[in-house]
Amino acid sequence: VGSQLIENRAFRAAIEFSDYVLSSLPTKPNWKIVDIVTGECAENAIQKPEISQTVCTAVQMGLVDLLASWSIRPSSVVGHSSGEIAAAYASGYLTAAEAITTAWFRGNTVTKNTKDGSMLAVGMGPGKAEEYLADFDGKIQIAAINSPESTTLSGDTTAVVRLAEILKAKGEFNRLLRTGGMAYHSHHMQPLGQDYCARLTEGLDHIRKVGLSDSSQRYPRVAWVSSVHPHKTLDPEKLNASYWQMNLASPVRFS
């Protein structure tokens, strides 16, 4: 799919600009997004968080630009987990440079995680899920409320696997997710949050100082519903690194 999309001028320009922004950072990747998108890389490269999160955001932004080149723009936007970065871009809350920088430092920071974590999708609402979690002494948390009957849980691998066995015995739908040992939106991410916030703040300051980002480069603003603070109207000028720190560690309130 990527090799086909890259043939479109608007999509390719978005990918190449993202690569250019990342190459300007003091802490930069040793790979290029365009190589990942076109398959010019090792097959398992996309499984690394710093690559998968960065490339996923770049592709999402490329699709936003592609649709915009056809005069197709959203009237409102919502994002899920790291998908909020591209959602903020599409809704005019972030520039392209701010968005790809946010994604890169998120992925790069979580590679420092040393805890063994897992995530579990379950076919129940958060209230019912909490009843099961009460027996696990804080080792598992609700990571995402996806719909009234779909919740994602996250935490210590041993506890998550045990819960999966319990749910299976009770006939409750559950599925372990492939996250490369990461327990996103759980206590595993809390120790990484401050480092992510500090590094991202420096990165955003850098791209602004070198002229790669200013507010005039944002899309016209449309409604964006935050899945961190779904009942708040966010001020784009206050959408700083602290927000993305919360996005990494807090539950996704998608529903």
PLM regions and their residue ranges:
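Short, surface-exposed "cap/lid" segments of acyl-processing enzymes
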Residues: 1-13, 17-18
